[in-house]
Amino acid sequence: MTSRVVAVLLIMLLGSSTAVAPASAQTVDPEQPSPSNTTLYFWGNDDISDCWGNFDAEGSAGSADEGYGDEVDGSDNQRLEVDITCQMKYNFDEDVFLNPTGKISIEFGIRLDHAEAESEEDEDLNITLMKGNVEVASKAFPDLAIDEDIQITWDLDVEENTTRWNLSGDEPRIRFTISKVGWDSSGTPCEGVFQVLKCGGSFRLYYANNQDGMRSQIQFPIVDAPEI
């Protein structure tokens, strides 16, 4: 009787070990996208000369403590001229697949400071989603408020060219461009060769670790790889 009980317990123990082993062996890398890890967060340094994305919500190491970066332009052209691209900090470990009927949700917190005067050289804020070096979609955001925090929200349908993102080449990037007339400390638009005071503008990009309630992230409708 005793030997029979021991045998039953041994079988149960072996069975439970076999069942648990695969689950315990599986590890999830927080820096890699997956169907359960779909949000790409953005961080950067104080002057946005370096900005990057990471799927790890705690991956803010090296980012500005204030939770944002400012590009301040006061150059000879007396304009706010921004052309910034943020890319993923790490390459994909494997190809990423999106739900073909889903949406890519793009959100960024920004703040602009420039003159409200208009010129032929003006360009509204443009945000471009890129797949590696290839432009996927671009959208202009006209008539944005000056010197106020702005939460940009842009939902983008998944298209045929965005259902699959290949590793080591198709990692997502986001690009910001804007060109506007600057102004000086008196609040007067820049006046070219007649300008006396230092003149320019600024562009602020909030990062995922900001304390102002602004969101800077991209959510992808990631699904499991299709069966071959």
Residue ranges and their predicted role:
Residues 10, 36, 123-125:
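Residues that flank catalytic or metal-binding motifs in active/ligand-binding sites
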Residues 101, 116-126, 130:
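Short coil-to-beta strand junction motifs in C2/discoidin
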Residues 10, 100-104, 169-171:
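Glycine-centered small-residue hotspots that permit tight backbone geometry or close packing
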Residues 124-184:
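Aromatic- and Gly/Pro-enriched, solvent-exposed loop/edge beta-strand patches characteristic
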